[in-house]
Structures are given as C-alpha cells and as structure tokens.
A protein has these predicted regions:
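Accessory C-terminal segments flanking Radical SAM cores
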Residues: 177-277
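Canonical Radical SAM [4Fe-4S] cluster-binding loop centered on the CxxxCxxC motif
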Residues: 2-38, 231
Length: 370
C-alpha cells in the first residue's frame, strides 16, 4: 500500500474497556458521549487537496459510537489505521464485512496478555485476529514487553504462532524500578527484540530546535475536535468543526520529547540521522550496528557529547570500562550541567556491578546543555 505522507492522529477517546497495569490513561469504561462528525473531518482533509492517513486511536476506538460508519466515511478518500485491543467482537466482525482492506493501512493490535487473560478473552482474540487476516487486512499484533513480562514473552509468542498469529514485541515506554525504558533494557533487549530491530524506533527522541513539518504534514485531533500541531506539541491550530490554520514550512520543534511519528517529519543532518540510527540499534542491543552508526555520526559531528555518551554506553556493554569512563568524561566536560552525563560518569567510577548507563536521546545535542 502507498501510505500517504500526511498523517492525522485522531485521539478519539481516552476511555477503554481494558485495565492494563502499565497504561498511562486512567481506566474508564463508561460510554463514550463526546463524538465528532466524521463528515466534517473528511471535509477538512479533502480541503487540503492531499491524501491523508488517519490513525484512529485512544483509548479503544471500537467502543466509539458509529465507529464503522466513521471508517466508511474516512476511507472514501483517505486511508485509515486503527490502534485497538480487538476485544469488541461484534464491531470487529462488522468492520471485516464492511470496510475495504485496501483502504486500511493496518490494524495495530495490542495483545495485553495479562489483561486478556483476566477477562478470559484469549480465544476470542484469536478468532478476531484470524478473521481479519483471512479477509486480507494487515494485522500487526504487538506485545508490550513490560520488564515483568520479559521471561514469558517467548512462551506467548510461540503459543500464538501455533494459531497463525505473529507477535511483534513492543518496547515498554516509561519508568520501572527507577529506570527509563526502553533504553534500560540494555543487553537483555537482544533476547526479545533481536529479530525486530525496527522496534528501536519506539524511542521518544529530543528534537527540540530542529526544523519539522508537524502542523502541516502531521496533526493530532482531540476528542472535542481541537487540532494540535502534533502529539507532543499542544499548540492549537483550530477546531476541525470550525477552522484550522495549518503551518507553513518547517518551524522548529519546541519539545524535548517526541512521543510519536516525529522521525517522519523532522529534518535531520546526516550526522543527526546516524545518531538516531545508533540509538535505535542500541535500544534493541544490536550493539555492533549501533557502534558503526555512532562512529559515523561522530565523524560528521566531532565532539558531539550525546554521541560520545552513547559510544560510552556501548563500550561499557563490551566490558571496556576505561574507554567508557573516558567517553563519559568527555561528554560531561563539554556539557558540565547535563544530569545524564553526570549520572553515567558517577556510575562508571563507582564500578557498581549493577550499573547500567543511560542512552542520550538529544538529537540536537549541541543546542541543549541539559
């Protein structure tokens, strides 16, 4: 499928019928009452003169009133994708019957195995996933590998494979036991993500100050119709039920954390792109590929403290303690107030057996001392 480069992420609702322990939304399974007119949304997108991919997300989109009608409306001229737990079986069946798979980029399906088991929904999940696959939809079943689930992931992956359902490990993003994930998987990541290096892209980079087309080619639509520049930048561009004023050109990113899709819209130098690749490889413990990318980045941006820090992380993983300390010292000397560099150097000097240095995500590092 030729997926449009213009993307709108519609956060339809924050309500969900699941209660996952690691979810950052409060559990709310009451009926959705705040709804938008899909015809108005479609008219806005049509008015740009460009095709769009509309990502339907939440919360749980399939509990949204009239969801199948909405999908039909949007797919007349645009492509959709859906983030779902695939638990509302009646709606899944209706979707499979009424919606053209050629107009659906994919269904990004969250397995949430512990919650699925709690509601006794494993068998229904298998039926729903197989129905969509057999109808020709692309179904990507993701498994959030919370640190407490690392050991059982392999077992669950093999179980669903027996039913013809491939499981993709998805890095947990957040804090667990004082460590920031996904960076904190360290070398453990190879066991889980070794066959899925693309999952290194699930990193919230710091693009602050870099030119970005978000607000023109990437939008976030809220449940009340408010349009933000992007998921990370809550600058209001208008309301889809009234008027929306899109940005022009590539205004700089204003946020230190890009939670979604930024890599498709930000403009990077060659060295910055190499730094990003190096981090992505490091997160999934593809350490040699990471080293090569970061060394190439450093050649293009000599003395970059973020790159030096990350090469130090890799040296530490290889057991090259002196080299790691040298790189951490160099990074900190260039940016003395950076808390991450301070913590890494202190940890390396302490030689604690459990020390695991942190990866730097500051792509525009020279502009951000902390």
């Amino acid at each position: 499928m030729n997926v449009p480069s213009n993307r709108m992420i519609w956060n339809m609702t924050r309500k969900c019928n699941f209660r996952c322990e690691y979810c950052y939304f409060p559990h709310d399974n009451t009926p959705v009452t705040e709804t938008l007119d899909a015809e108005r949304i479609s008219a806005f997108l049509n008015g740009t003169g460009k095709p769009w991919k509309v990502g339907l997300t939440g919360g749980e989109p399939f509990i949204y009133p009239g969801i199948i009608d909405i999908c039909e409306t949007l797919t007349r001229n645009h492509v959709i994708g859906i983030d779902t737990n695939l638990s509302v079986s009646s709606k899944v069946r209706e979707f499979a019957e009424r919606i053209d798979p050629a107009r659906v980029h994919n269904l990004y399906v969250a397995l949430h195995i512990e919650e699925r088991e709690r509601v006794k929904g494993v068998d229904a999940f298998i039926r729903n996933a197989r129905l969509l696959l057999d109808k020709g939809f692309e179904v990507i079943v993701n498994y959030v590998v919370h640190p407490t689930l690392e050991e059982r992931f392999i077992r669950d992956r093999d179980f669903f494979a027996e039913h013809g359902i491939a499981i993709t490990p998805r890095p947990f993003r957040g804090e667990h036991e004082g460590r920031r994930y996904p960076e904190a998987y360290g070398d453990r990541a190879d066991k889980v993500f070794g066959d899925h290096p693309e999952q290194g892209k699930k990193v919230a980079f710091n693009f602050q100050g870099l030119p970005c087309s978000a607000g023109r080619t990437l939008l976030r639509l809220e449940p009340d119709g408010t349009v933000f520049r992007c998921p990370g930048d809550k600058t209001v561009l208008g309301n889809v039920m009234d008027k929306v004023h899109l940005y022009e050109g590539f205004p700089p990113c204003t946020k230190k954390r890009c939670p979604c899709r930024g890599l498709d819209h930000v403009r990077l130098t060659y060295a910055q792109a190499d730094l990003v690749r190096g981090v992505q490889y490091a997160v999934v413990a593809a350490n040699e590929d990471s080293r090569l990318a970061l060394e190439q980045a450093l050649a293009g941006s000599p003395g970059n403290p973020c790159i030096e820090n990350n090469l130090g992380v890799l040296a530490w993983r290889r057991g090259e303690r002196d080299e790691a300390r040298r790189l951490f010292e160099s990074a900190l000397k260039r940016v003395p107030d950076n808390r991450l560099y301070v913590a890494n150097l202190d940890g390396a000097r302490s030689q604690r057996p459990d020390f695991d240095p942190q990866i730097c995500l500051d792509v525009n590092a020279s502009a951000h001392p902390d």
